[in-house]
């Protein structure tokens, strides 16, 4: 993921800050904000950032109610969050990501996807046991890319797979101009 100095990046479901810290380490000139609903986890993230003197802000909040202005980020990232969300919450969270992204901004999601083989179907069982069969079903059925496109994003690409192919890496772009017939977060 290419980022330019001065860009603003939001990490939705930042947890202990691992992804936010990695982004800041690789791109020290970007402004990184993490958001997570767990205060104890955010305290850990803040300590980790202070320990390495990384200027990262961590905010308390939810993916489906982002406390940020419209068009305030150049990139929105999320790692292993969406498979925890109920289908209707996934939709609202994607609309919120769309809302806070600037036109031309990119969404990057790493999350459990549709298994492509019998081995992968077996490999996702621990995710399903830990996170619940209902929560993960939507992702395993391959619905996340459809939801991303239905939200109004363009240029959706699966850019790779990691963790034995269980986790899909998706990239999509908020259009610079939205047409009247395009489904957006406001429709």
Task: Please annotate each region the language model reported.
Residues 64-75:
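A short acidic, Gly/Pro-enriched loop at the edge of an enzyme's catalytic core
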Residues 10-12, 16-65:
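Class I SAM-dependent methyltransferase SAM/SAH-binding core
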Residues 25, 108-151, 155-168:
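C-terminal alpha-helical "lid/dimerization" subdomain adjacent to the S-adenosyl-L-methionine
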Residues 1-5:
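Conserved alpha-helix/loop element of class I SAM-dependent methyltransferases that forms part
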Residues 8, 104-106:
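Short glycine-centered segments of the SAM/dcSAM-binding site in methyltransferase folds
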Residues 91-103:
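A short glycine-rich, Lys/Arg-flanked "PGG" loop and its adjoining helix->strand segment in the class I
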Residues 75-88:
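A short SAM/SAH-binding and catalytic strip from SAM-dependent methyltransferases
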Residues 169-187:
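C-terminal lobe and adjacent flexible extensions of AdoMet/dcAdoMet transferase-like proteins
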């Amino acid at each position: 993921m290419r980022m330019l100095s001065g860009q603003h990046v939001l990490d939705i479901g930042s947890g202990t800050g691992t992804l936010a810290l990695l982004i800041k380490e690789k791109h020290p000139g970007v402004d990184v904000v993490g958001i997570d609903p767990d205060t104890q986890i955010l305290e850990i993230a803040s300590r980790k950032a202070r320990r390495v003197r990384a200027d990262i802000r961590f905010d308390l909040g939810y993916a489906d109610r982002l406390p940020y202005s419209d068009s305030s980020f150049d990139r929105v990232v999320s790692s292993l969050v969406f498979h925890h969300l109920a289908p209707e919450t996934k939709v609202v969270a994607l609309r919120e990501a769309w809302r806070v992204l600037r036109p031309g901004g990119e969404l990057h999601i790493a999350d459990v996807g549709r298994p492509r083989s019998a081995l992968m179907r077996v490999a996702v069982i621990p995710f399903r046991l830990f996170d619940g069969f209902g929560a993960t079903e939507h992702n395993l059925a391959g619905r996340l890319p459809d939801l991303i496109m239905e939200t109004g994003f363009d240029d959706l690409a699966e850019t790779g797979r990691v963790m034995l192919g269980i986790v899909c890496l998706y990239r999509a772009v908020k259009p610079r101009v939205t047409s009247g017939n395009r489904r957006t977060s406001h429709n």
